[in-house]
């Protein structure tokens, strides 16, 4: 599930993209937008991430790395995503049904369900767009129910159905959808209408459900089983995109580094070989999850403590740290992954500022693995391949 703070958004135009695809291939573009009224809250972001993984608390993920490589494709779709607030969440427009209704959905590699507000919902937010199954000629009943709850007490539940899902021009037929009949206020008061999970199908709420990515592959809508993720920074105007079936080589510099994925827990788990600051190592290897649905960079407590010590950051006792507000006195946080190095630059080390007090973009959670959320991902382009499985990472272009 994608966990974010509540905020509204302002639409932002997206730019044309150079996608790695054959000339006849399609592009699906999902633009990002920013919210000028958003006020970040690092403590709440940590709480949400802890709640997200509470039901998997005993799990951890790890993997070995492999050699460098790149991916091409003959058919692809590009979905622009909206950057809400201070890079707190990213969502894209997805069309569901016939005639289609446009829904704003969180794109989340840390979960695998496709669910959204519906006209059957008794407590969904008044500002949410609600899918009406009675108005779609391609809707079919399923008969099953779904329910999901998180460690912070939030939950959502409803019924399953089938309908056509248009993902940036790629029409998925008979996609299982989860229609919310009830949802917690943390969802109903948010800027999005639901969630599109991009994790592995082993962690869908209802067993045996195929994810949208599964169906893009099985229905032959994409020939290359990958999706490329670019998350723009609010400081640079926001923006971003998901490309299904390919990636955008103009968005990163250098070569893609290929890293093996451990998907035994349903996530994109990788091994981080180490972390350093100013050339000094601050951590040995540890496991991490690449999660577009988490805002911050959440580290195991021992790793976070070492990183904080190097920055003279003070522990607030709630998973967050106060850090020096002067970025000129900070150095990038560098991770070695698959034999290559990837940075979290100094401008991303500060997430929240209130006067002379700054809260860091990194923190610690309740798990023995790290969650590499948007603080890392907005600085590094990632190509996800669920079939191998593997990811490919490169620094974003300046």
Swiss-Prot record:
Any one GO BP annotation for this protein: proteolysis
Chain intervals with Low complexity compositional bias: 58-78
Intrachain disulfide bonds: 121-124, 325-358
Main enzyme class: hydrolase
E.C. number: 3.4.23.21
Endpoints of the signal sequence: 1-21
Organism: Rhizopus niveus
Stored InterPro entries: Aspartic_peptidase_A1, Aspartic_peptidase_AS, Aspergillopepsin-like_cat_dom, PEPTIDASE_A1, Peptidase_aspartic_dom_sf
The protein's name in its UniProt record: Rhizopuspepsin-4
Key word Transferase present: no
UniProt xrefs under PROSITE patterns: ASP_PROTEASE, PEPTIDASE_A1
Keywords: Aspartyl protease, Disulfide bond, Hydrolase, Protease, Signal, Zymogen
Lineage: superkingdom: Eukaryota
Single GO MF annotation: aspartic-type endopeptidase activity
Domain Peptidase A1: 90-394
Region Disordered: start-end pairs: 58-83
Propeptide: 22-74
Sequence intervals crossing the membrane: none
Catalysed transformations (reactions): Hydrolysis of proteins with broad specificity similar to that of pepsin A, preferring hydrophobic residues at P1 and P1'. Clots milk and activates trypsinogen. Does not cleave 4-Gln-|-His-5, but does cleave 10-His-|-Leu-11 and 12-Val-|-Glu-13 in B chain of insulin
